[in-house]
Amino acid sequence: MSNAKKFGVFLVVLLCAACMFVFIYTLVKLSLQEGESSSRLTQAVVNQIGEAAFDEELDANQIHALNLFLRTMAHFVLFSILSFGMCTIAFLVFAHPAGRFFGLVLNMLICAALAYGTEYFKQFVDGRHFQIEDAWLNIYGVIIGLCSFLIADLIFWAIRARSSSQSE
């Protein structure tokens, strides 16, 4: 591999790592905010969605259901994105298949620790509490992110193999 290509890969890894660091910081910052602030933020988003999606004002049951849906999807989607991004970094850092497998296993351990840790440390924040259901949603998000990455990698590999066989 040429030095220019190595430098390009280094820059991509550095950019991905910086983006993931910012993402993790934001995730932890949001996760560990005071309970009242978190509730106000979610309620404001629920009200905006309700106003945009429906012409009438939402009743208490609809507000509760939408609030639950948003919080559930936030856990799930955030950790899916985190896992997908960290898998991308692992594949850029490790070139050989054994190294990539190690990178994916390390990724899963880091993401699972973050998934559980963000929930665990909520109990030390005013107005927040630990919920094992949320920790499991986070871990399911990590698994979906990994599976999505592996599917995307297989599709990319198949396209690349097909294009190289057609060029011969």
Q: What function would you assign to each model-found segment?
A:
Residues 2-87:
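"…centered on the first transmembrane helix and the immediately adjacent amphipathic helix/loop
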Residues 4-18, 102-105, 147, 151-159:
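Alpha-helical hydrophobic membrane-insertion segments
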Residues 22-27, 111-118:
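Alpha-helical transmembrane segments of multi-pass membrane proteins
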Residues 77-94, 140-156:
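Membrane-interfacial alpha-helical segments at the cytosolic side of multi-pass membrane proteins
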Residues 95-112:
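Internal alpha-helical transmembrane segments of multi-pass membrane proteins
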Residues 115-143:
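Interfacial helix-loop-helix junctions of multi-pass membrane proteins
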Residues 160-168:
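Short, charged juxtamembrane terminal tails flanking transmembrane helices
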